[in-house]
């Protein structure tokens, strides 16, 4: 928890950065994507934040308040309240936050559960909120929304069964709800005068099932349970008996991970392998179906369900019209750690990011994905645009350098076996004739790029460990490489040999030339930002870059007046270069920041993080 406590001291004297946009969606949260009852907004989690995204415009609102990743989200039937739960460390209290939707602010913080909040549900008339604790907690608690306090609690499952993982309220009565999980299905009655909840175990006979998802019919006649086996159970909440199960054959692959009842009858079912199906009881055979990318974790209706939204584990949000059952991808993002971000030379209109198995090009103002280049089962560690804009050069962990056309994503050429233990860093010269790459074994290699050929000019062997960052001087006669062996080396690119070496007791993660190119700034795991003389490699000054974690990314403006840093303390910091003071701090990331860039023309700062999020900030000074 120390990473959450310490940033407050630094934020005190610095001005807060203005967050303009977030590209990101945590698709791993079960039923995390919700369509608000006003039918104009989507609500979904990203790290510790909850995003309220307007469906028809680019407008976004952010709910900040959780100290750790959000694990569940619920919206009341009236749309007045949003509730969200989080995970935390073992033995610590995990908070539930009740938000006022209209004012977009925190109303109450409800703390009782330990470790994790598994699921949340509102009663139909906004009277109660029921919460389910995680495996270390195992309790179910009913909260009064008016008084904002707990009414009563109870262990969620019996002694000889597994944990309960899902909860749903009755659609008509404020006193009944259902919990289900590993081998347990319970219907609960709330007894308000005695402040107790009474469970009744549902009988499924010989069937033993682990419940993944749950949905209640509009008139409370039945509720449906999706299981890891890939079938659906239909239960009667009054008799607590099994009505029917299905499908008998062709069960849903990787389990029924999302389920949703429609008012007109029938079910929408999402499976763990990305199949979206419309089916009806009792056969549960697919009437309509489409295949989506990534396991489906959320299905949420817009209004009565003529249109609905689907969220998948690969951070895709689809809009589907029920009548023609065709999907439209409306939001997408990286679902793994983003390794690098880069702007093309001289334009801030678009930028590229890379992560596991793909490179994506984004339109800056609309947050739209323009292009996706996929290389299956590989991780891209670094990218750079050639100065002429004709190719994107990328560094991959299979030891290859790949070049792609930025408009089409066509593979232009591959340099095989560029490095032994993967390519970890890459840079290009401004005359577009050379590519400089760094590898996991510590070699720095200079490649000559011709019209049809790619030739190795020199392998520079000095570093003992992986190269983390490469920057080239404007004149293309010199470059600096930072390595995790604790050295930064300045190379002469004309004679292809070492000019100067900088030693420090740290794993260097990032390096920048000052625009006047007589100084460099470095940072890394010792949290210090150091200024060095290029000429003799002597240290000029050291600043404390962060109080709590490594600094992973850094970029400097063209004028050299300000620079930005980001790292494991999840904060974006803008620094005055000469004073060495933090002028602005950006709070919003919930994963470790991996890389950060200032756009050409100093309009935006774009930072990327290990949870797959891309954040765009307004550059605080007039350009």
From Swiss-Prot:
Subcellular locations according to the entry: Cytoplasm, Cytoskeleton, Cilium axoneme; Cytoplasm; Cytoplasm, Cytoskeleton, Flagellum axoneme
* Repeat listed as a keyword: yes
Q: In which tissues is it expressed?
A: Expressed in trachea multiciliated cells.
Record's superkingdom?
Eukaryota
Which Pfam families does its entry note? WD40 (PF00400)
Stretches forming WD repeats? 65-109, 112-153, 159-198, 291-330, 333-372, 375-414, 418-457, 462-501, 503-544, 546-585, 588-623
Q: What keywords are assigned to this protein?
A: Cell projection, Cilium, Cytoplasm, Cytoskeleton, Flagellum, Repeat, WD repeat
Would you kindly state one Gene Ontology biological process term found in this protein's UniProt entry? flagellated sperm motility
- Report the function annotation for this chain: Microtubule inner protein (MIP) part of the dynein-decorated doublet microtubules (DMTs) in cilia axoneme. Important for proper ciliary and flagellar beating. May act in cooperation with CFAP45 and axonemal dynein subunit DNAH11. May play a role in cell growth and/or survival.
- Subunit structure comment from the entry: Microtubule inner protein component of sperm flagellar doublet microtubules. Interacts with BRCA2. Interacts with the CCT chaperonin complex. Interacts with HSP70. Interacts with AK8. Interacts with CFAP45. Interacts with DNAI1. Interacts with IQDC.
Q: What is this protein called?
A: Cilia- and flagella-associated protein 52
Give the species this sequence originates from. Answer: Bos taurus (Bovine)
Q: What is the lineage of its organism?
A: Eukaryota, Metazoa, Chordata, Craniata, Vertebrata
């Amino acid at each position: 928890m120390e990473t959450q406590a310490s940033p407050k001291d630094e934020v005190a004297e610095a001005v807060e950065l203005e967050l303009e946009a977030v590209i990101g969606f945590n698709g791993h949260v079960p039923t995390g994507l919700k369509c608000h009852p006003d039918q104009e907004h989507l609500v979904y989690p990203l790290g510790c934040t909850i995003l309220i995204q307007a469906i028809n415009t680019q407008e976004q609102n952010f709910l900040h308040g959780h100290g750790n990743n959000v694990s569940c989200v619920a919206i009341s039937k009236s749309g007045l309240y949003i509730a969200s739960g989080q995970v935390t460390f073992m033995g610590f209290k995990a908070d539930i936050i009740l938000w006022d939707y209209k004012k977009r602010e925190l109303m109450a913080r409800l703390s009782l559960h330990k470790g994790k909040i598994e699921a949340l549900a509102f009663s139909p008339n906004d009277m109660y909120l029921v919460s389910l604790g995680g495996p270390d907690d195992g309790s179910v608690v009913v909260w009064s929304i008016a008084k904002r306090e707990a009414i009563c609690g109870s262990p969620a499952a019996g002694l000889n069964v597994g944990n309960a993982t899902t909860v749903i309220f009755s659609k008509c009565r404020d006193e009944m709800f259902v919990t289900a999980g590993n081998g347990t299905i319970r219907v609960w009655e709330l007894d308000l005068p005695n402040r107790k909840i009474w469970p009744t175990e549902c009988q499924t006979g010989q069937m033993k099932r682990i419940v993944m998802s749950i949905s209640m019919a509009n008139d409370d006649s039945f509720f449906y349970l999706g299981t890891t086996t890939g079938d659906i159970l239909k239960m009667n909440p009054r008799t607590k008996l099994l009505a029917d199960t299905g499908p008998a054959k062709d069960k849903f692959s990787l389990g029924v991970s999302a389920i949703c009842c429609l008012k007109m009858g029938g079910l929408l079912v999402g499976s763990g392998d990305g199949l979206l199906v419309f089916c009806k009881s009792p056969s549960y055979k697919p009437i309509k179906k489409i295949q989506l990318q990534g396991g489906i974790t959320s299905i949420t209706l817009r209004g009565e369900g003529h249109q609905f939204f689907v969220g998948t584990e690969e951070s895709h949000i689809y809009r589907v019209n029920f009548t023609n059952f065709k999907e439209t991808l409306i939001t997408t993002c990286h679902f793994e750690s983003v390794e690098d971000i880069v702007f093309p030379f001289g334009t801030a209109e678009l930028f590229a990011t890379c992560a596991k198995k793909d490179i994506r090009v984004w339109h800056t103002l609309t947050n739209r994905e323009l292009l996706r280049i996929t290389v299956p089962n590989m991780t891209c560690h670094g990218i750079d645009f050639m100065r002429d804009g004709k190719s994107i050069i990328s560094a991959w962990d299979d030891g290859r350098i790949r070049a792609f056309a930025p408009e089409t994503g066509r593979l232009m050429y591959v340099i095989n076996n560029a490095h032994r233990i993967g390519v970890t860093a890459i840079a290009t010269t401004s005359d577009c004739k050379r590519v400089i790459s760094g590898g996991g074994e510590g070699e720095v290699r200079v490649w000559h790029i011709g019209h049809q050929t790619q030739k190795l000019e020199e392998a520079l062997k000095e570093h003992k460990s992986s190269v983390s960052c490469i920057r080239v001087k404007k004149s293309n006669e010199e470059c600096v490489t930072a390595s995790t062996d604790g050295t930064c080396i300045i190379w002469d690119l004309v004679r292809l040999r070492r000019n100067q070496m900088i030693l420090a007791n740290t794993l260097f993660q990032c390096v920048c030339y000052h625009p006047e190119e007589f100084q460099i700034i470095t940072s890394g795991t010792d949290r210090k930002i150091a200024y060095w003389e290029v000429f003799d490699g002597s240290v000029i000054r050291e600043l404390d870059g962060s109080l709590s974690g490594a600094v992973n990314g850094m970029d400097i403006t063209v004028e050299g007046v300000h620079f930005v840093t980001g790292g494991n303390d999840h904060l974006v910091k803008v620094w005055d270069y000469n004073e060495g003071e933090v002028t602005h701090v950006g709070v919003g990331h919930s994963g470790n920041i991996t890389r950060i860039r200032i756009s050409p023309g100093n309009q935006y700062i774009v930072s990327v993080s290990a949870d797959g999020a891309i954040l765009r900030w307004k550059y605080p000074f007039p350009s």
